[in-house]
């Protein structure tokens, strides 16, 4: 019998090694199954999809450093801030904008309550998340009543669970983030397009020409007719004021047209002079559904406002020139304790003084009664 050659010995050695390796893997696989584990091979037909990962940056415990263990990532804001929705459309716009600005200023997360979302979301592309009712009920809130102008104390609020109340609507809260506010209050396309279609059909009555400038006019009436004189010793915009405001635009803009909206349209028809053919009574005046009137005003180039937050926001978002009713209360009005004109109207806006003679007469008739009792 011939002794095995060197080649045969090498092949036999390789066969033994292969059998040993296979036996080792087989035992390893059985052990893994016995301990409740399983090996799986990646599917070659498709790439694995990574699951969402939440990264939490823990603070470094070293006293020599204040940095986060996740370099370059700012710490996530803690706590929850919200605001109690109160009042009508313009009030809630002011509350939304103030909440957003103050939360950012203090590094907190802002949430709105469902009622505010229901009021604003059908009109605007707002982005603040909605706070679940259960979370609202179970949270131990610190409540803070805001006055209607920015104060230094509001820039260093430390409560992590804060619920604002009040009716803030001052540009001093949010004007530094104006472009962000304008994005939040972007109209939905169907509202913007409907308003632009209506404006595009307007013609000047005397010439039939297309107007070159659109001036939105908002005339606030309704409950203010009683509230202003009886509670605040003030007035609303009257016929003379509106005439002055419109003449101001006629003197500065060629071929303007005035698009009037109001919650008192009958009064507007009777008191606004439309004989020049440059006035259109376009609003529906429905306070329960303000979207169409508001969309019309914001799509105009300029604004005439009387008083109220609805007119303020229409002017703020429209941009351009704004004429407003100035000094509409008596100097001793309690209203001036909660309202600062310099914080309510932008410095570049133009004020026309109100005629206070009606409320002076009314105030004079009250004066003798102050000394009784």
UniProtKB/Swiss-Prot annotation:
Superkingdom field: Eukaryota
Enzyme class of the recorded protein, top EC level: transferase
Protein's recorded name: Galactoside alpha-(1,2)-fucosyltransferase 1
GO cellular component: Golgi cisterna membrane
Keywords attached to this entry: Glycoprotein, Glycosyltransferase, Golgi apparatus, Lipid metabolism, Membrane, Signal-anchor, Transferase, Transmembrane, Transmembrane helix
Pfam families in the record: Glyco_transf_11
Cytoplasmic side: 1-12
Record's subcellular location: Golgi apparatus, Golgi stack membrane
GO function term, MF aspect, one: galactoside 2-alpha-L-fucosyltransferase activity
Reported function: Catalyzes the transfer of L-fucose, from a guanosine diphosphate-beta-L-fucose, to the terminal galactose residue of glycoconjugates through an alpha(1,2) linkage leading to H antigen synthesis that is an intermediate substrate in the synthesis of ABO blood group antigens. H antigen is essential for maturation of the glomerular layer of the main olfactory bulb, in cell migration and early cell-cell contacts during tumor associated angiogenesis. Preferentially fucosylates soluble lactose and to a lesser extent fucosylates glycolipids gangliosides GA1 and GM1a.
Residues carrying a glycan: 66, 301, 327
Membrane topology, as annotated: Single-pass type II membrane protein
Glycoprotein is among the record's keywords: yes
Keyword check for Glycoprotein: yes
Metabolic or biological pathway, per its Swiss-Prot or TrEMBL entry: Protein modification; protein glycosylation
Tissue expression profile of the protein: Brain.
Other comment: There are two genes (Fut1 and Fut2) which encode galactoside 2-L-fucosyltransferase. They are expressed in a tissue-specific manner with expression restricted to cells of mesodermal or endodermal origin respectively.
Catalytic activity: a beta-D-galactosyl-(1->4)-N-acetyl-beta-D-glucosaminyl derivative + GDP-beta-L-fucose = an alpha-L-Fuc-(1->2)-beta-D-Gal-(1->4)-beta-D-GlcNAc derivative + GDP + H(+); a ganglioside GA1 + GDP-beta-L-fucose = a ganglioside Fuc-GA1 + GDP + H(+); a beta-D-Gal-(1->3)-beta-D-GlcNAc-(1->3)-beta-D-Gal-(1->4)-beta-D-Glc-(1<->1')-Cer(d18:1(4E)) + GDP-beta-L-fucose = alpha-L-fucosyl-(1->2)- beta-D-galactosyl-(1->3)-N-acetyl-beta-D-glucosaminyl-(1->3)-beta-D-galactosyl-(1->4)-beta-D-glucosyl-(1<->1')-N-acylsphing-4-enine + GDP + H(+); a neolactoside nLc4Cer(d18:1(4E)) + GDP-beta-L-fucose = a neolactoside IV(2)-alpha-Fuc-nLc4Cer(d18:1(4E)) + GDP + H(+)
CDD domains: Fut1_Fut2_like (cd11301)
Primary subcellular site in the record, as a coarse category: Golgi
Lumenal side: 30-373
Organism: Oryctolagus cuniculus (Rabbit)
Transmembrane segments: 13-29
């Amino acid at each position: 019998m011939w002794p095995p050659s060197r080649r045969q010995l090498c092949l036999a050695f390789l066969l033994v090694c292969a059998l040993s390796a296979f036996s080792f893997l087989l035992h390893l696989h059985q052990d893994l199954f016995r301990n409740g584990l399983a090996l799986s091979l990646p599917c070659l037909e498709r790439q694995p999809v990574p699951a969402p990962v939440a990264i939490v940056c823990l603070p470094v415990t070293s006293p020599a450093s204040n940095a986060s263990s996740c370099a370059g990532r700012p710490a996530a804001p803690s706590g929850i801030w919200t605001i109690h929705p109160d009042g009508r459309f313009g009030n809630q716009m002011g509350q939304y904008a103030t909440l957003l600005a103050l939360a950012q200023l203090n590094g907190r997360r802002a949430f709105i309550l469902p009622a505010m979302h229901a009021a604003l979301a059908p009109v605007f592309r707002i982005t603040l998340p909605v706070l679940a009712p259960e979370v609202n009920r179970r949270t131990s809130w610190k409540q803070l009543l805001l006055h209607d102008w920015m104060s230094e104390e509001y820039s260093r609020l430390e409560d992590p669970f804060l619920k604002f109340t009040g009716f803030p609507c001052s540009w001093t809260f949010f004007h530094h983030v104006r472009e962000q506010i304008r994005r939040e209050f972007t109209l939905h396309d169907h509202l913007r397009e409907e308003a632009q279609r209506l404006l595009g059909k307007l013609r000047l009555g005397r010439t039939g020409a297309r107007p070159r400038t659109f001036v939105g006019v908002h005339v606030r009436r309704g409950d203010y007719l009683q509230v202003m004189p009886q509670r605040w010793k003030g007035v609303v915009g009257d016929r003379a004021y509106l005439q002055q405001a419109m003449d101001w635009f006629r003197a500065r803009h060629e071929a303007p047209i005035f698009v009037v909206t109001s919650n008192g349209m009958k009064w507007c028809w009777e008191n606004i002079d439309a004989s020049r053919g440059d006035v259109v009574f376009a609003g529906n005046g429905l306070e329960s559904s303000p979207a169409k009137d508001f969309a019309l005003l914001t799509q105009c180039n300029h604004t005439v406002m009387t008083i109220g937050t609805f007119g303020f926001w229409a002017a703020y978002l429209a941009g351009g020139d704004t004429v407003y009713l100035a000094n509409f209360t008596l100097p001793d009005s309690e209203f001036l304790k909660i309202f600062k004109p310099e914080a309510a109207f932008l410095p570049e806006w133009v004020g026309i003084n109100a005629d206070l003679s009606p409320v002076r007469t009314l105030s004079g008739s009250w004066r003798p009664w102050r000394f009784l009792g």
